[in-house]
Regions:
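Polytopic membrane enzymes that build or remodel cell-surface glycoconjugates and lipids
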Residues: 2-439
Length: 439
């Protein structure tokens, strides 16, 4: 009876977390456009590929720098069906993220946290800045997949009714995650830490071993490409010297209400204090929670610590942060609750700001891209040179014109450029993304 009650409680947790995230992230669902060039490029690729989206050369190209055949094939499939219906596309992405958050809440509940703390963990993860960025940009399907696979492995291991089932789930889902994104190489490390902090339970050790098998095979084939294949000057070029600064950025980003990676984070000292208070709250409960946060965090970030930081890279890290904080919550004193709540509230404000930015970019894209296609069509092969009325929005249009072969059947490519300095333009991009012809 107790097991049945816990099982029902887990399903209710899942439903509640998913519902809350779908509601709070509805501005991301009802975004009429897209954030960046990736979506436009893959919409074009989807029209060029003939036959099934999953039958392509991506699967055999194991030495491609970004070997993500599952991600790119799935993206192609969804683009074919939903690119012209942005609400549907965004709904799929947000729903997938909401499911991940719900699964995390179940995992935390099964690990021993109370119902309320488990529910809060799901929201802290699913409504945090990292998840908000992932939910708002359809290009981040890969992170949704590998984190989903990791959570399902964790849940199967915790349930552990049949050892052989845990072995199969760990082996198969780690393999699937690796086909989605190279970040999945961290899965065995996360499982090994779960083994250590769970009192060295055998199920976690077995899950670690079976998850490690595909990772070892994957790295034996792809390690050289991953380490040496990044073009010089690209954001994927790696440097060991940036590990400390990157690590700190990922810690502080949730409470830094600003664009990720900008020079000089606003009010750095208060941000560090808020983060430090949360860390102190964990320390006062027990040092093992601080160690768990640090070790799980480093493992979840793993290889991204050596490359240029980006908000979506912290998606897995935010999941383990939410889990550790929730497990410590019931043992905290009141001031600890205040410290963690302050961290969570500032993070939520950051998420609201991100939603505003992402939705604004989508609204502009929904007007800009069709207007640009029409302008190119009217130009009869002459270049379309654009100036931007509000230079603060220039980053949006740099993305929206970057390496876009075609839009809605109209060839773009070299026919479109943004004016530099005093260069003459024949169109000006207005505040709302529409185009105004210039004399």
């Amino acid at each position: 009876m107790r097991t049945l009650t816990a099982h029902g409680q887990a399903w209710r947790l899942l439903a509640a977390v998913v519902a809350c995230i779908l509601i709070f992230h509805s501005p991301l669902i009802f975004n009429p456009g897209y954030l960046s060039h990736d979506e436009l490029q893959w919409a074009y690729q989807a029209t060029q590929h003939q036959g099934s989206a999953f039958v392509n050369g991506l699967w055999s190209d194991v030495h491609a720098f970004q070997y993500r055949p599952l991600t790119f094939s799935l993206w192609m499939l969804i683009s074919r069906q939903c690119f012209d219906h942005p609400f549907a596309f965004h709904a799929i992405i947000v729903a997938a993220g909401a499911l991940n958050a719900g699964l995390l809440s179940i995992a935390v509940f099964r690990a021993g946290a109370g119902v309320r703390a488990s529910f809060a963990a799901g929201l802290l993860f699913g409504l945090g800045p990292y998840a908000t960025y992932v939910h708002g940009w359809v290009a981040i399907i890969a992170d949704l997949i590998w984190v989903f696979c990791t959570l399902v492995i964790a849940l199967a291991t915790m349930r552990n009714r049949h050892r052989w089932l845990t072995w199969i789930v760990s082996l198969v889902l780690t393999s699937i995650a690796l086909l989605a994104k190279e970040s999945a190489v961290v899965i065995p490390a996360l499982l090994a830490l779960a083994w250590f902090f769970s009192g060295r339970q055998r199920a976690w050790a077995e899950a670690t071993v079976f998850a490690a098998i595909p990772v070892i095979a994957y790295l034996s084939i792809r390690l050289q490409t991953i380490l040496m294949g990044a073009p010089s000057g690209s954001p994927y070029a790696w440097h060991l010297s940036i590990i400390p600064s990157n690590w700190l950025k990922y810690q502080l980003y949730p409470v830094a209400i600003d664009k990720f990676g900008t020079e000089g984070v606003r009010a750095l000292l208060p941000i560090v204090i808020v983060w430090g208070l949360m860390l102190l709250a964990l320390w006062r409960v027990h040092i093992r929670y601080v160690l768990a946060l640090l070790l799980f965090g480093i493992a979840a970030l793993g290889p991204v610590l050596i490359v240029h930081p980006a908000a979506w890279y912290g998606y897995g890290y935010s999941a383990v942060t939410a889990a550790v904080v929730a497990l410590a919550w019931t043992h905290m004193k009141r001031w600890g609750h205040v410290a963690v709540s302050l961290f969570a509230c500032i993070g939520f404000l950051h998420s609201v700001n991100l939603m505003r930015i992402i939705h604004d970019a989508g609204e502009k894209q929904s007007r800009f891209s069709p207007a640009l296609a029409e302008a190119v069509k009217k130009s009869h092969g002459s270049p379309v040179v654009l100036s931007v009325k509000n230079e603060k929005d220039r980053w949006i249009y740099i993305r929206m014109t970057h390496d876009i072969p075609s839009y809605d059947g109209v060839k773009m490519g070299e026919n479109v450029k943004l004016a530099e300095g005093s260069e003459a333009a024949n169109y000006q991009v207005q505040e709302d993304g529409s185009l105004k012809p210039l004399p």
